[in-house]
Amino acid sequence: MNSFPLNHNDASYSQDARLYKGISSEKRLIKLTTIPQVLSSLELYANDLPALTWYGSNDERLHLNYEILLSEIRKVVHWLRMHHRIVCGDRVIVISSNCPEVYVLQIALMSLGAITVPVNNNESPMVFEKIVDKVNPKKILTGRDVESNLNSVISSKDNIPTIPFAYGEPTNDHKWDDSGVNADDPAVILFTSGTTSAPKGVCLSHYNLLVNAEGLGQVHNHSVNNVHMCIMPLFHANAFGFSLIGSLYAKNHVVLCSGLPGITFWKILKDNFINIVSLSPEIIRVLTEIHIPGEDFPSLRYVVSAAAPLPKKLATDFIKKTGIKIHQGYGLSECVNFAATVPWNISEKVFEDILNKWQVPSIGASLFGCTLDVLNKDGVQAANEEEGEIVVTGHTIMLGYWGDDEETSLALKGGMLHTGDLGFFSEINGEKFFFVTGRKKEIIIRYGENISPLTIEAELYKLRKIGFFAITGFFNESSGEEIGLYILANYTSENLNFIRHIIKSCPSRYKPRVVIFGKEKIPATPTGKIKRSILAERFKDFSKKSFGSDPVFIKE
């Protein structure tokens, strides 16, 4: 057993946050409560079913049924145990793009009772070092497409093995249900930006993951042998919780792509009889532009929009051009992934209402295992259509932030998960449907990824040489939010070249898309804290612009 370390003073908040309709998380809502139990069930009932089809970036393709998948997991378990002495409770950092190796490895680690720590393969070296310091990993395992600067830092560590595939001999005597893993043991640490430049590690238990998987199965009517397409990266909460764990739990067939396959997306969708695919709004925007007129996808029920708010215009454009419905979902790493989703069996009338009646499309109703609510400005339950902060309670709520009692206490203050998102609910046929209207916090959500402005400022610190600057997120229809850099410096060719050089050396995920050479004072409190929401107003003219790899430079 590997219990999550929690300050006893915070225990009551934590326990209250995990109540679901008055039921303690110690009273289980599901039968299979650990990954080893799920694997044991698959061995009994799913051996011949298709499990994984992979499309690589270089026309690579691989297909596994559950019998072969389980065999590969066993081989990697053996490799982890015998070659690296990985045991229950060990943290293992995993860095790779989507591929069969990383898919198998994540499951193998959790089946051992080890804690997998997926990290972005394009992560900043500075942030990566902070993650390493925080989790103190037993091993760092690398796979495909690791960014060169990050790879250099990783290579400086001792004895970094690559992720194996089909390694070693099968160990058929291994019993999944004899592994000694408990429901409340940590299974994964997903890193997300906080209100400081230090990343926060969201620690989720086996039970957290599997209650969410049950909820996903109910809301999307998952049944054995359904086909789920995964494009989003497996280090992201949506892909990890929905595509990996949710599909494994439901005995689904996953079609895994190493990235967005472009125009071939539609062929993959049709050839594999995809039933459901989870996409970010930006991917939906791209697919709207490259849709093949006249194509029909009879197997596809709908697209799930995730990771960032879905603009109404994008939703209506996509539906009009493709004839494919979009069911928006909402969640955070802190509650596994989805906490609310538009259900599979919604009526046509209600679907039209929640898409068009309000200024933003609905994120749906609460998922099984958790409950959404809205607190008004006075901190009490909001009335119908009254805006406030969205909060979540239930059995999917995280164990806490790894090694950070203070941040855990703040997040679960008052016995509920405070999301930092503003929204409201509207009762439709006796059920609360929720809507997200904005952000309470300053975190930038770009293409579904949480990024701290302070992290970006730390990456660009050399700009202080030419002037005071600040980073803010601003609304953008394509990405949800974009990164804006405001700098108090003269608009000269020398300064332009210097900023270009600094931005070019910055990881792509942190690169500003608009740079304003300003003259107005950067808004701040008396203590110097940047008022980013006010600063964002200076970037409002770029809400409809799509950006390339180079930033736009503006003289104010």
Question: What do the PLM-derived regions correspond to, one by one?
Answer:
Residues 48-50, 173-191, 197-198, 221-227:
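Conserved pre-ATP/AMP-binding loop-to-beta segment of ANL
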Residues 274-279, 288-357, 371:
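Gly/Ser/Thr-rich phosphate-binding loop
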